[in-house]
């Protein structure tokens, strides 16, 4: 990346909870009154969001298994980040229960003496990668949206053509 650009994702930045990568010209959004006025309300940060796409497995049973795992890992990851679940604080026992569920469902061991957030983020990425390696149904999805809505997928052909869209005027 150029010198004054940063790549931000949930591995590198603690408060990023979206399953995406972000290339930005600043590490933080600047929303001070003077700068907003100077730049016509535009925070002096610009960037590009990069959403990864994965193919869905041909076997519906395998597809549902990955969706359940990805959903559970993501929920626990968010709970760790915000230290709350369903608008209420999670106790250590509740968190431990959910981490044990992830371990059981995914067949992994999570070290309690290391960063839970980093381990879960890695596991989340690994599960989406593994899902994409299954025999493909020919359908592609944005995993972040698909995890909540199983109907969010499109034929692979949709992503194989480019459409030029002019930028401003």
What are these regions (language model features)?
Residues 2-58, 77-168:
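Conserved catalytic core of two-metal-ion nucleotidyltransferases
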């Amino acid at each position: 990346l150029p010198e004054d650009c940063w790549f931000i994702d949930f591995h590198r930045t603690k408060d990023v909870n979206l399953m995406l990568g972000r290339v930005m010209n600043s590490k933080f959004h600047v929303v001070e009154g003077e700068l907003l006025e100077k730049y016509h309300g535009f925070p002096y940060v610009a960037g590009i969001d990069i959403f990864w796409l994965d193919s869905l497995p041909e076997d519906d049973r395998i597809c549902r298994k990955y969706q359940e795992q990805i959903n559970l890992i993501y929920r626990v990851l968010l709970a760790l980040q915000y230290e709350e679940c369903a608008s209420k604080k999670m106790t250590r026992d509740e968190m431990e229960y959910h981490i044990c569920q992830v371990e059981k469902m995914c067949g992994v061991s999570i070290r309690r003496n290391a960063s839970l957030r980093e381990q879960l983020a890695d596991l989340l990425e690994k599960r989406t990668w593994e899902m994409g390696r299954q025999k493909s149904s020919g359908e592609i999805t944005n995993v972040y949206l698909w995890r909540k809505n199983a109907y969010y997928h499109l034929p692979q052909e949709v992503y194989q053509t480019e459409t030029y869209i002019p930028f401003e005027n």
